Amino acid sequence: MLKLDLKERDSLDLRCIAGHHGLANPITISDLNRPGLVLSGFFDFVAYRRIQLFGRGEHAYLLALLEQGRYGAIEKMFTFDLPCCIFSHGITPPEKFLHLAEPSSCPILVTRLTSSELSLRLMRVLSNIFAPTIALHGVLVEVYGVGILISGDSGVGKSETALELIERGHRLVADDLVEISCVNGNSLIGRGVHKSIGHHMEIRGLGIINITQLYGVGSIRERKEVQMVVQLEEWNSSKAYDRLGTQELNTTILDVSVPLIEIPVRPGRNIPIILETAAMNERLKRMGYFSAKEFNQSVLKLMEQNAAHAPYYRPDDTY
């Protein structure tokens, strides 16, 4: 039904009590539905493609229907291709309900979580699964808590820069091909495309190296939010590079704007240290302090003070 890793399965605490043969039912939408209106007999609009969540209220109404022998709404509900039904609070539905659900191949699941907890966790899991995704060439690293996507042409030194950052205590998320998903509409989460080979790096002249084995598990991360893109490029003497840092560049990934820094590469430049400084500077910006603008304002203020104390004429002026 859902491709969940061990951590996600544990967080949902789901167990199937009926309809095991329907566990392969596809889930095609990330929204949830509370089937109160359907149980009351309103079928003009049925959100049948959504996971059906039964809380205490729906369970109490369900018991009332079954005690009165009113099975029509329940039977009609199961004529739709429901992906699954989940009962929260550890509630076990009555046997009659399970019997009515059996022919429809609809899995009946139970969790100990409350309805609110289940909704929040399911929405988080489903948002990650159904998030729009793109694969980009580059290296994703975490530097001082900032997720930096290092991009650039082949051979410009992306992997070598990332390797030096790892040596300096920072962490690798993915090398060569980074899978980026847009979660909740404004958060870009990056990870390796293949978990089994995600923390390997290719270094020209050295070959493939295993970062986990060489530097330990503290040198890697499974995923990280992309908070900055650093574009490495060969030094172009005819190009005017920003030397003050007052020009803020941005790039767009999956319709989300991300700060962009263009760093020219040439012999003698210590790119890893520049990236460390860029990461700390980005953190300062997020805290409301912009070094370049502060410097620019200080210079303008100094010029105004000097202008105020300057004489209106020089003694040697002649008329």
Curated annotation (Swiss-Prot):
Keyword set includes Magnesium: yes
Disulfide bonds: none
Renumbered residue ranges of the record's region Important for the catalytic mechanism of dephosphorylation: 264-269
Molecular function (Gene Ontology), one example: protein serine/threonine kinase activity
EC number(s) reported in the record: 2.7.11.-, 2.7.4.-
UniProt entry keywords in alphabetical sequence: ATP-binding, Kinase, Magnesium, Metal-binding, Multifunctional enzyme, Nucleotide-binding, Serine/threonine-protein kinase, Transferase
Residues given in the record as ATP binding sites: G152, D153, S154, G155, V156, G157, K158, S159
Important for the catalytic mechanism of both phosphorylation and dephosphorylation: annotated span: 201-210
Cofactor: Mg(2+)
InterPro entries assigned to the protein according to its UniProt record, in alphabetical order: HPr(Ser)_kin/Pase, Hpr_kin/Pase_C, Hpr_kin/Pase_Hpr_N, P-loop_NTPase, Ser_kin/Pase_Hpr-like_N_sf
GO biological process, one term: regulation of carbohydrate metabolic process
Reaction catalyzed: [HPr protein]-L-serine + ATP = [HPr protein]-O-phospho-L-serine + ADP + H(+); [HPr protein]-O-phospho-L-serine + phosphate + H(+) = [HPr protein]-L-serine + diphosphate
Residues the record marks as active site: H137, K158, D176, R243
Superkingdom of the organism of origin: Bacteria
Residues at which Mg(2+) binds: S159, E202
Subunit structure comment from the entry: Homohexamer.
Further facts: Both phosphorylation and phosphorolysis are carried out by the same active site and suggest a common mechanism for both reactions.
Free-text comment about domains: The Walker A ATP-binding motif also binds Pi and PPi.
Protein family membership: Belongs to the HPrK/P family.
Full protein name: HPr kinase/phosphorylase
Organism: Treponema pallidum subsp. pallidum (strain SS14)
